[in-house]
Amino acid sequence: MAGLSHFDEAGRAHMVDVSDKPVTARVALARGEVRMSAATLALVTEGRADKGDVLGVARLAGIMAAKRTADLIPLCHPLPITKVALDLTPDPGLPGIVVEATVRTGGQTGVEMEALTAVSVACLTIYDMVKAVEKGMEITGIRLLLKDGGKSGRFEATP
């Protein structure tokens, strides 16, 4: 399967051998949104959710998820993550919460999956913490915005 590095010549899945790759600085930025009603957003931003600090708990969940990515995604390498930061921004225009995760490492492979996992789990945590109020929330737009470092260089998503 040409172009798909996680498959061998016979089409069997395998973990890519990165042992000959140089250690370089890597960074990835991912983004997602949790869309909800204006009333639910107010509940979150005013700290009135029954389960507590929605944004604080979601931030911690995203950080924890980034560190556990190799346990969740079968062919991801365990990496020495040097930074995970999550920004959770209320956006009345959605209405909802915009979640962005930045992940850094000095390693032989990138941290795109860690950033995407952090965003995904933070969004799921927001949903979990307020689903009693609104089950129709929508998790949307999860995507990689930026990756830099390594052989393939820099990628920036188009707006």
Curated annotation (Swiss-Prot):
Pathway: Cofactor biosynthesis; molybdopterin biosynthesis. It holds the Pfam family MoaC. It is an enzyme of class 4 (lyase). The keyword Lyase applies. Keywords: Lyase, Molybdenum cofactor biosynthesis. It catalyses: (8S)-3',8-cyclo-7,8-dihydroguanosine 5'-triphosphate = cyclic pyranopterin phosphate + diphosphate. The active site is at D128. The keyword Nuclease does not apply. GO terms for biological process: Mo-molybdopterin cofactor biosynthetic process. Its EC number is 4.6.1.17. Belongs to the MoaC family. NCBIfam families: moaC, PRK09364.1. Homohexamer; trimer of dimers. This is Cyclic pyranopterin monophosphate synthase. It comes from Cereibacter sphaeroides (strain ATCC 17025 / ATH 2.4.3) (Rhodobacter sphaeroides).
